[in-house]
Amino acid sequence: MPSRVSPGIVNVTDFVAAHAKKFGSYINYIDREEAIRIDHFDQQNILSVDGYNHYMENPKKSSGIFTDQYDHLTPTQRVELKKQFTVAQKHQSVMWQSVFSFRNDFLAENNVYNPKTKQLDEAKLRDATRVAMNDFTGKMGMTHSAIWSAAIHRNTDNIHIHVAIVEPQPTREWKRVTVEGKHGETYQEWQRKGYVPKKILNHFKAAFANEMVDRDRSLARISDLIRQRLQPDQRSAWRHQSSLD
């Protein structure tokens, strides 16, 4: 049986309610130094495995937090971000977390990562994250209510982007859920809905991938296909038209 080839990019998304311990931990570490944040990553992360079913370990290196507006946050901006996440928790917002994971050869093929020099085009990954988040919040109806923060994490063998999303002024509907207590007892409480439809998740991943894939290489491939399908006399006309464009 032939071995299954894993995709070049995978995404896993989940959510927790406002009272979840890891929601509070994420907030507590927002304004801490990056070395401290990655040392305590497991206390903030709600995703046990990435899309390749690899255990989500503490990253060896992190780019630091970025957002929709800023590539790198100043200490003052970190404090402000922490305040917004705190308000979201106080108002019973859901916290979604999403991870994009990559195969290194896929990143190399798309000129995002150089395996020899270990250089990573973080700007391209940030741009792709912003495009994907714009798609996600739009389709979830949270364009004007959601805020998010993200960081690029690097381990020995893989690179991934970890994103956290909240609503300081929540718009999600309430639902009654059964919760298990500390001693195994169960009870019901009201929580905001955090479910994300599969169709939205598929668009989310596609938006990221489409932004990240090397456009020059894609355009070259399209041009090759056009040339292959045209008759010889049509090719010269097509080249002439292209030069005019």
Language model region names:
Residues 1-159, 163-245:
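N-terminal nicking endonuclease/strand-transfer module with a His-rich metal-binding environment
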